[in-house]
């Protein structure tokens, strides 16, 4: 979905984290987070992702091991950039109020679908919804293990 829907994965993770921790996540919070972090996502994270993906395609005339070493370095930089974005969102959501909505599969799926739908250039398909529900299930399973 990161590719097919142009999803900002750190934003999706933030939405899921807030929802399962009993915090409000609504269109206003989504919009505020997008406004704050989209320049970082656009100018830092996405260019690193593009370079990593191009290196992965193997279409450059470099030795495979050297190209792979560079790709791994770019991948590490991309992940570091996403962690910085997550920290930005963490700081921005400290004052988010509690939610009355229970963090169950249906509600978490709806929150994640709101994020994906807001970022996608196309309408969400049943396949997208299936993937969103899988992500919601994984988040809830992880939370159950932590409890």
State each model region's role.
Residues 24-40, 101-110, 130, 147:
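Short alpha-helical "patches" and their helix-cap loops
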Residues 139-147:
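Long hydrophobic alpha-helical segments typical of transmembrane helices together
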Residues 55-138:
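A charged, amphipathic interaction segment
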